[in-house]
């Protein structure tokens, strides 16, 4: 009840100041700006800080046995000005215990076998550590700008593979969020204690990882990071193919179904330990199989340095779509690196692993099989787009989902246009991202800025379609070049950090050189929707005036499609800037000496909730 009241107060205050277009912020956010960790200029404040850690993780398994055993050493650095007397540990695997994790029949989660902090045994009770957060008290406080070392041994039984992690089949496993980790401690919320219940996603610090995965012979491992010992775990021919793929634009079949049947791809030790390294990244994930095909190639993502990113795919031989995944990803990385966001793909690799989740991880994608190749490519495009948001930008997915899903949805449309043409991409975007929202009920609509855990209606709309439309509306208003300049300002300011919505707003204003408060207020701080009405078309001495009413409220672009009496047509585009002075009623002037026969207002992908009032003269409804 207190949470609802607080949100209501925030939004009530926002509406009270609507005339001034104030971008209201909660007290804890305002406090971060006041303390100097955030800046109204868009960049991190002079006193900005963030914590990080080094993880050295060793995992072992022996499929089809689903028991996963791990040990890890963590060096955690407290860069904050605060003295930490406890650490909050994230145990995401416990999400599989369900909504009643303490019930006697609840599935088992992760079990910590031993935990030491700075060499001393820490207090840990597995019977209490059943949720996705567990606070650990420190015997000695962790002082500002100091570090500590943790050693943890743990095990758990892998769940079924229908979600973001689990057993895909009896000998194909996907491990994600599989290790205890220190949660984010930041400058505006302190410890991130947001429970993970399976719906919302994640928020992690940028850390360095060493990952060792021990599996029986003939099992291949794919993981976040760069493989350190290919010549130890692969037979020479397959190590040679892998190395060749690092400079090849064409797909190289590292391991085919025939190769797998021969059972001579890996070193023939009883077990092999695959070792991976990655730096300044927010998480690691891995896939394991003894019967998945392995394709690979690479692509130049940075023309200045000629840096290449490795592209790999792991999949069942019967999945025709995955045979195309390396080729698809080659196009994806090339397009994203050179168009929008127009930032070279920031990591050394991407791998698509066949599973069930259609889910992104740093350098990894867990995608389901589909017979529709166009849809398969679109899904992979969307998941790889998440490389930038959140994995490059470090946003809080669990609290501000629109800061990553909205961008991935936007890039999905833009690259889809390049791949399939504007008409097909627009139609998919409307059907998959917009129509259900815009034609649905709006009485319970909540502003996009609403923290994701507090969205009680239309959470998917607030995370995907609505924010994506806001980004596209801004692109339409600023124009491609200025929009890209502003976006790069935001990304340059905040990559590898932890931006919040107000950092985005301030960076985009700074990068564009324009005061966009009115636009951001309209799109993010109101419960608006899309519904324009063409109320009147009036002849004037120089042409015509179109009188439009913005019933829904969002500042959207639109086309005025004019049909003249002589049969000719003209389309006049209006960007969202037309709504800056008056967001409810505007007049659009049409200069012409021709007689207008009819006018239709069409928003394209900005789908109108009620098209019946978008045409003049008004067409009588059929009886």
What are these language model-derived features?
Residues 99-106, 155-209, 229-230, 605-623:
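Glycine/proline-rich low-complexity spacer/linker segments in large multi-domain proteins
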Residues 84-120, 214-219, 563, 568-574:
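Solvent-exposed beta-hairpin/edge-strand motifs
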Residues 72-74, 91, 146-160, 209-217, ...:
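Short, hydrophobic/aromatic-enriched beta-strand segments in well-ordered soluble domains
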Residues 186, 201-381, 410:
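Hydrophobic helix-coil surface modules that form long, contiguous segments used
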Residues 26, 67, 77, 104-171, ...:
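A surface-exposed beta-strand-loop module
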Residues 222, 537-602:
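Beta-strand-rich binding/interaction modules
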């Amino acid at each position: 009840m207190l949470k609802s009241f607080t949100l209501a107060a925030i939004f009530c205050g926002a509406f009270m100041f609507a005339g001034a277009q104030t971008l209201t912020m909660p007290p804890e956010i305002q406090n971060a700006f006041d303390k100097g960790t955030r800046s109204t200029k868009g960049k991190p404040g002079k006193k900005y800080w963030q914590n990080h850690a080094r993880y050295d993780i060793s995992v072992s398994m022996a499929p089809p046995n689903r028991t996963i055993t791990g040990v890890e050493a963590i060096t955690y650095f407290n860069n904050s000005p605060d003295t930490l007397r406890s650490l909050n540990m994230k145990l995401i695997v416990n999400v599989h215990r369900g909504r009643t994790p303490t019930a006697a029949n609840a599935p088992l989660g992760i079990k910590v076998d031993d935990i030491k902090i700075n060499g001393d045994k820490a207090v840990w009770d597995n019977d209490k550590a059943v949720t996705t957060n567990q606070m650990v008290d420190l015997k000695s406080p962790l002082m500002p700008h100091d570090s500590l070392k943790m050693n943890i041994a743990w095990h758990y039984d892998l769940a079924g593979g229908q979600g973001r992690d689990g057993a895909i089949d009896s000998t194909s496993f996907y491990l994600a969020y599989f290790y205890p980790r220190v949660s984010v401690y930041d400058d505006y919320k302190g410890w991130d204690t947001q429970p993970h219940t399976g719906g919302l996603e994640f928020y992690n610090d940028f850390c360095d990882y060493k990952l060792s995965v021990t599996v029986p012979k003939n099992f291949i491992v794919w993981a976040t990071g760069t493989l350190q010992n290919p010549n130890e775990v692969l037979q020479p021919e397959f190590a040679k193919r892998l190395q060749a793929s690092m400079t090849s634009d064409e797909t190289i079949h590292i391991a085919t179904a025939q190769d797998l049947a021969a059972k001579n791809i890996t070193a023939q030790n009883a077990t092999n330990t695959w070792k991976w390294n990655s730096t300044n990244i927010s998480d690691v994930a891995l896939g394991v199989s003894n019967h998945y095909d392995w394709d690979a190639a690479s692509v130049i993502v940075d023309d200045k340095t000629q840096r290449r990113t490795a592209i790999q795919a792991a999949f069942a031989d019967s999945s025709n779509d995955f045979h195309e995944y390396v080729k698809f990803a080659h196009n994806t990385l090339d397009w994203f690196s050179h168009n929008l966001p127009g930032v070279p793909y920031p990591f050394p690799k991407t791998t698509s692993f066949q599973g069930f989740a259609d889910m992104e991880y740093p350098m990894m994608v867990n995608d389901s099989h589909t017979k529709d190749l166009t849809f398969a490519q679109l899904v992979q495009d969307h998941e790889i787009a998440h490389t930038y948001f959140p994995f490059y930008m470090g946003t809080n997915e669990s609290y501000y989902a629109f800061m990553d899903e909205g961008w991935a949805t936007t890039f999905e449309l833009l690259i889809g246009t390049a791949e399939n043409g504007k008409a097909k991409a627009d139609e998919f975007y409307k059907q998959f991202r917009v129509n259900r929202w815009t034609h649905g009920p709006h009485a319970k609509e909540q502003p996009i800025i609403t923290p994701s855990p507090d969205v009680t209606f239309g959470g998917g709309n607030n995370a995907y379609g609505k924010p994506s439309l806001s980004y596209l509306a801004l692109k339409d208003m600023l124009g491609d070049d200025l929009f890209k300049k502003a976006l790069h300002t935001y990304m340059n300011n905040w990559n590898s950090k932890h931006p919040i919505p107000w950092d985005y707003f301030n960076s985009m204003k700074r990068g564009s050189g324009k005061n966009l408060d009115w636009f951001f207020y309209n799109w993010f701080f109101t419960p608006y929707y899309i519904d324009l009405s063409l109320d009147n078309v009036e002849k004037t001495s120089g042409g015509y005036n179109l009188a439009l009413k913005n019933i829904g409220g969002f500042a959207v672009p639109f086309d005025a499609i004019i049909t003249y009496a002589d049969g000719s047509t003209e389309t006049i585009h209006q960007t969202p800037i037309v709504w800056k002075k008056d967001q409810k009623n505007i007049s659009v002037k049409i200069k012409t000496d021709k007689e207008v026969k009819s006018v239709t207002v069409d928003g394209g992908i900005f789908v109108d909730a009620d098209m019946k009032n978008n045409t003049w003269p008004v067409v009588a409804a059929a009886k």
